[in-house]
A protein has these predicted regions:
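C-terminal motif of bacterial Sec signal peptides marking the signal peptidase cleavage site
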Residues: 15-18
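Disordered inhibitory propeptide/activation segment of secreted metzincin zinc metalloprotease zymogens
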Residues: 22-112, 230-242
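Acidic helix-start/capping segments at beta-turn-to-alpha-helix junctions
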Residues: 102-104, 134-154
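Zn2+-dependent metallopeptidase catalytic core
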Residues: 111-134
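Catalytic zinc-binding patch centered on the HExxH motif and its immediate surroundings
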Residues: 113, 145-173
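Surface-exposed patches in mature extracellular/periplasmic domains of secreted proteins
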Residues: 127-141, 208-215
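Short pre-active-site segment immediately N-terminal to the catalytic Zn-binding motif
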Residues: 177-197
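The catalytic-center signature of Zn2+-dependent metalloproteases
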Residues: 190, 195-265
Length: 275
């Protein structure tokens, strides 16, 4: 996922998970083949700010596709009940009970990232789901690999590889920004854990809580404010908030930079999917 600092009239500051490019490139798709843009549109993705990167394309700020993987995306159902509820993708993790192995391969700050990863694992495992998590020491063992790459400045923190595959495997890797100064020895462990837990949520099938109206958590209307189906499905999870806002959800599109452990609706959603 992509996260940025945004300011509006110097009144607020938030960090955005996904879907917002640097101003200079947010509307430029000149380098993207028209065939790719047409396929994105046909499968429900926004073409705002599509970015050509090594080996493929970054779409909606948080999804990476090669041309081949894009062609395999199937259009899923889009069931919207309200504006701020928990939603899942069409594909979920299968073969339960299952242990998802996570490796921290971030190139620096090993103690910080190991501690944050362990906190993420503890958060999920505390719920007693049939989907559990375990940290492993090598990428070869891992189902989800956390890596570092220079994603530029401007407050960009990271990007995930999307959502579960058609055969029920989690998306990998989660890429966090390794540009100098993005993360430091003084970075709060629990805040970093919230960032990683959010990305892990996507890899196991969680959409943004406010995917249909990101203005709710971001405070301003962004390009592609309603993320739509995005070719992966946006299915309401029964039992979660269907009539009022859910300000503390770990899957909101924007965060204020504080720790967000699972709130009651988050727990309901995860239990519905994986208990």
């Amino acid at each position: 996922m992509k996260m940025k600092f945004l300011t509006a009239a110097a009144v607020f500051s938030v960090m955005l998970y996904s879907c917002k490019k640097d101003t200079a490139s947010s509307n430029s798709t000149a380098s993207i083949p028209q065939s790719i843009l047409n396929e994105l549109t046909a499968k429900g993705f926004s073409t705002d700010g599509v970015q050509a990167v090594d080996g493929g394309y970054v779409v909606e700020g948080d999804l990476f596709f090669t041309a081949e993987s894009l062609s395999s995306v199937k259009v899923g159902p889009n069931l919207v009940v309200g504006q701020e509820e928990q939603y899942r993708t069409t594909n979920l993790i299968t073969g339960l009970p299952k242990v998802i192995k996570i490796c921290n391969s971030y190139p620096t700050l090993l103690p910080l990232f190991n501690a944050a990863t362990d906190s993420v694992i503890a958060r999920y495992n505390k719920l007693g789901l049939r989907l559990t998590f375990q940290r492993v020491s090598t990428a070869a063992e891992a189902d989800i690999n956390i890596i570092g790459d220079d994603l530029g400045g401007g407050g960009v923190l990271g990007r995930s590889s999307g959502f579960p595959s058609a055969d029920g495997k989690p998306a990998s890797p989660i890429t966090l920004n390794s540009r100098k100064g993005t993360f430091t020895k003084t970075t709060n462990v629990q805040w970093l854990a919230t960032v990683i837990a959010h990305e892990v949520g996507h890899t196991i099938g969680m959409r943004h809580t406010d995917y249909a109206n990101r203005k709710y958590s971001c405070g301003i209307r962004l390009p592609g404010n309603n993320e739509g189906d995005s070719g992966v499905g946006a299915i309401f999870i029964p039992g979660t908030n269907s009539s009022y806002a859910d300000p503390g959800s770990w899957m909101l599109a924007c965060t204020d930079g504080t720790n967000r452990p699972f709130n009651p609706n988050d727990v309901i959603a995860l239990n519905y999917l994986y208990h």
